[in-house]
Amino acid sequence: MDINTETEIKQKHSLTPFPVFLISPAFRGRYFHSYFRSSAMNAYYIQDRLEAQSWARHYQQLAREEKEAELADDMEKGLPQHLFESLCIDHLQRHGASKKSITRAFDDDVEFQERMAEHIRYMVETIAHHQVDIDSEV
């Protein structure tokens, strides 16, 4: 077997992108392995850093969501449905609605009460989201 055939075989079966066997054994022993070892270590280090950053972002997002939820809960307690009933009585009577129909909707209509509660929750969650944005800017 001539040297070219042997070189081709080694290149085909080599895992490195260049022919390692052409490097002197002394160089391979001292520098080559330490270079690849440090490169592998750097690759693991970079991967670990990326994963740590990903987890940090995840925990920040969880903390933000928890802060928003707590703020929304507090706001929801301060915004009961009877305040909306009073608002509707004050303003809708001027536009043809009777006090009795408004009171019946707020007191007796379960579907209306459920949808009103959903709407109030949506309002306070949106306001809480914007409040956390404003607080984080400062």
Swiss-Prot record:
Keywords: DNA end degradation evasion by virus, Host-virus interaction, Inhibition of host innate immune response by virus, Viral immunoevasion. GO terms for molecular function: deoxyribonuclease inhibitor activity. One of its GO terms (biological process) is symbiont-mediated suppression of host innate immune response. 2 forms, GamL and GamS are isolated from overproducing cells; the shorter form (GamS) is more abundant. As both have good ribosome-binding sites they may be independently translated. GamS is processed at the N-terminus and starts on Tyr-44 and Ile-46; both start sites are present in equal amounts. In cells with an induced lambda prophage a protein consistent with the size of GamL was isolated. InterPro entries: Gam, Gam_sf. It holds the Pfam family Gam. Both GamL and GamS bind to host RecBCD nuclease and inhibit its activities, protecting the viral DNA against RecBCD mediated degradation. Isoform GamS mimics DNA, preventing RecBCD from binding DNA. Expression of this protein in E.coli renders cells more sensitive to fluoroquinolone antibiotics (which inhibit topoisomerases and induce dsDNA breaks). Frameshift mutations that delete most of this protein (starting from position 78 or 97 of GamL) allow the bacteriophage to overcome the retron Ec48 bacteriophage defense system. Homodimer. Interacts with host RecBCD without displacing any of the subunits; this interaction prevents RecBCD from binding to DNA. The GamS isoform makes extensive contacts with RecB, and inserts deeply into the RecBCD complex. This is Host-nuclease inhibitor protein gam. It comes from Escherichia phage lambda (Bacteriophage lambda). The gene is gam.
